[in-house]
From Swiss-Prot:
Family annotation (InterPro entries): Isoprenoid_synthase_dom_sf (IPR008949), Polyprenyl_synt (IPR000092), Polyprenyl_synt_CS (IPR033749)
Species this chain originates from: Porphyra purpurea (Red seaweed)
Protein's recorded name: Prenyl transferase
Binding site for Mg(2+) 1: D88, D92
Cofactor entry: Mg(2+)
Gene3D superfamilies hit by this protein: Farnesyl Diphosphate Synthase (1.10.600.10)
Binding annotation for isopentenyl diphosphate: K46, R49, H81, R98
Amino acid sequence: MATSSSLFHPIEKELYSVEHNLKSVAGTRHPILYAAAKHLFEAGGKRLRPAIVLLVAKSTSEQQEIKPGQRRLAEITEIIHTASLVHDDVIDECSTRRGEKTVHKLFNTKIAVLAGDFLFAQSSWYLANIGNLEVVKVITKVITDFAEGEIRQGLVHFDPSISIDDYIEKSFYKTASLVAASCRGAAMLNDLNSQMHNDLYLYGKHMGLAFQIMDDVLDIAGSTKSLGKPSGADFMNGNLTAPILFALTQEGKLDQLIQREFSDERDISLALFLIKKSGGITKAKDLAKEQVQAALCCLQFLPKSAPVSSLKELTHFIITRLS
């Protein structure tokens, strides 16, 4: 199975540059914000989002070159993603992320909210300096999508009546919108036609959805060590994801546990057992596979190249994260 480092080989130098720049994003004028941002970016992460932006940029360039604006867009994508995680952790009261203390636990809630706000503002500043108004419009829409997704999620906590379609729509707003918009933005900076913009947008959308579905599978099937946070953390907070929704169609007892919000100390372990027993995890993985197949179809117009191969292989990497 390919590793993320081998998949990123065509953009290895550019990704290293992005990583280096992220660690200095807050500057030294704001010591507390700098410390918070440094903590966030040094905690690591998969950096899949900036990598996808760079791969799209190279895949759609005749010379396989990455423009400065595209490199900056890759950084902006990760900054926006990180800002959203800071706010998510406050809302969900998470204590760890990527195996490290969350910002609001390391500092306090006020600093965490301000750090997230600062990163969103910083991303907007960098975005404006790319100098392409259409790209600015595409990317800034993502920030409103994040808020929309968070509101939708908050309104259906511990609600077993939500559908898979509701879940997919919420997942688009919270996760896939950023990947989709960033892919479109990278293509726009290479002056491609609108159909190509749309195909790459859809690639990003389907990849983002597949990634979110597999994240939700891992939340239930993964270990605390591999996740960097307690397993089952999302559904303990009432966030009902694909494996749970599929399990609900087979296990009536699970509905009862959700309705009482896992109030008994044994409810969580019983819920995990029922989800695994019902085949909910397998069905969720099948849903993720449908998304990656749709993503692959969106790349058919691109000529063969190493960056295109990496974009295709990334789909398999996402699906095999549990292997």
